[in-house]
Structures are given as C-alpha cells and as structure tokens.
C-alpha cells in the first residue's frame, strides 16, 4: 500500500478551506439580491459558480450556511472596515484631546461620524445592506445573537473614549445612544438614498444627538 503524500493532504485541505470560504461569501450576494429567505443551496451554488453538490457537501444544513456566512461577514467587516477606520481616527482623537478644547473635540467627533456614515452609504452600500440583514436575522435566530452582541460591544468600545474625553456622566450609554442614531441615519440613507437628502443632513442629525447627550 502506497503512503499518502503529506503535502498533497495539506494542499487538499487548503483547497477545501478556500472553497468553503468562497461558498460562504457567495451567500452574501444572495442575501443582497434576495434577502435571507433567498439563501438556498442551489442559489448559493449559482452565485459561487460551483456544483450544487459542493454546497451540500460543506453545508448540509442551510441554516448552518447562513449562520457561518453571517459570522464571517461580521468578523471581516470589523477587521477590514470598522477597525481600520477607527485606528486612523485615533491619531485625530489624540491631537484634539491634547488641545483640551471641548468644542474642537465635539466638532472632530461629528466630522468623523459624517465621514464614516457617508462612506458606508456611498461606497459600501452592499456591505451595509448585509449588515442590516444580519441584525434582522438575529432577532429570530439565537445562533446569531452572540455575534451581533460582540459586534455591538466592539463598536461601543471604539466610540467610548470620545465620550470619556467629553466627560459625560455615562460614556457607555452615550456610545449606545449615538450608535442608535448612526443606525437610524444609515437606514434612512439606504431607503431614501444618501444623495437625495438635503445637504448636511447627516451632520445635522449627529450634532443634534451629541447635544442631547449633555
């Protein structure tokens, strides 16, 4: 009996992992086009351009495919978009904090929020649609709630230092309130279209909410 080449086994495993991830990401496109209910083995196979047998081989249970696809999306969104954006914001935050000027700090926060929201609506609309589908699915899917909760906790942790610097009485609650406002603005932008709103509507909404936190 011939021995199995270890390199062959490693390469085979790598190809399997790559195809599995490809299928998970293909489910994102199905969700963008047809919503969560559109996720079926055949639809995902067509989006991934793989045989139907591949989707059923890696994900016999369609709910497991949905769950893992959404968990991967949450992880990659935070790593590839949210975290890098806030990492760049830290340098700006450090400069504004050193100035010890509350008005400048408030203005800097609003500027940052406008850039963040406008960028998501104008340049990352599909990603935003997926994110809202993810949140909606978690309402009726306990398996997704931990991932949603972790995403929320990470977002609060990134925003909280700004409100600590502004010396608000409850920086964590302030962060949650501001995140709720951000989501409301994003949802309005998705429904109505970011470019159809009046100029400065995002800035006005963020400024109003920031003043309400005092």
Where are these regions (language model features)?
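Amphipathic alpha-helical packing segments from all-alpha helical-bundle domains
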Residues: 121-132, 136-166, 176
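Hydrophobic alpha-helical connector segments
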Residues: 82-124, 178
């Amino acid at each position: 009996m011939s021995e199995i080449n270890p390199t062959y086994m490693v390469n085979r495993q790598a190809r399997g992992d790559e195809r599995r991830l490809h299928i998970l990401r293909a489910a994102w496109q199905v969700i963008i086009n047809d919503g969560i209910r559109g996720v079926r083995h055949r639809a995902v196979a067509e989006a991934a351009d793989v045989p139907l047998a591949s989707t059923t081989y890696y994900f016999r249970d369609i709910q497991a495919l949905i769950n893992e696809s959404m968990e991967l999306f949450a992880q990659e969104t935070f790593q590839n978009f949210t975290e890098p954006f806030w990492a760049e914001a830290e340098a700006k935050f450090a400069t504004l904090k050193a100035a010890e000027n509350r008005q400048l700090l408030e203005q800097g926060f609003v500027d940052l929020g406008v850039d963040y929201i406008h960028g998501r609506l104008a340049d990352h609309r599909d990603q935003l649609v997926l994110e809202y589908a993810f949140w909606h699915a978690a309402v009726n899917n306990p398996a997704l709630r931990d991932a949603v909760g972790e995403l929320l906790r990470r977002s609060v942790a990134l925003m909280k230092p700004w409100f600590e610097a502004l010396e608000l009485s409850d920086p964590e609650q302030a962060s949650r309130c501001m995140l709720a406002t951000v989501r409301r603005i994003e949802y309005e932008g998705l429904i109505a279209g970011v470019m159809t709103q009046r100029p400065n509507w995002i800035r006005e909404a963020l400024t109003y909410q920031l003043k309400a936190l005092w």
